[in-house]
Amino acid sequence: MQKLLLTAVFMASMQFAAAERAPIAIPKKVQEAINEDKQTCREMGGKFSVGQALDIIDLNNDGYHDFVYDMSKVTCANAPDLGGSGGWAVTVFAGQPDGSAKQAFLHGAVGTKIIGNKLYLGVGGELCGEDTRGKVRAQYQNCIRPLQWNARKKVFEFAPVSQKKPFPKSWAR
């Protein structure tokens, strides 16, 4: 009897563990953004790989997965880089109760990192509180700055500049 009970408990725990590891479906809007970049890469003669460019985390604490698509982590081998002078596009999609996602943030950045339960973007100049008058972008100071959820507008926004952190040397691409 005890052996049967242990077997039942083991089987139930295995089913629970499998459910915990079930793959998360990528919402249509997120997949469309990835596919658009994939097409651009192919048109330039490159080979596209999304790699680690998609993070899935509940950033706004609403119980639904949010999706962070960071183009700085995309590879477009044998073709020009998909970034520009403002860095690479970072798009955050807010997960919805029906499993879909809505774009809730889009901005250029020089990388992203999730620290705790916050998304930090590598930014520079005015976004770091710097006076940029008379400077070219190459002279701007970089920092990392978190996003925060604006529940009223249902979008992510940069948190106050007082929450910025120094730009880590490890973020060099």
Task: Briefly describe each language-model feature range.
Residues M44-G45, A77-S85, T132-Q139:
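Short consensus segments that form the blades of beta-propeller domains
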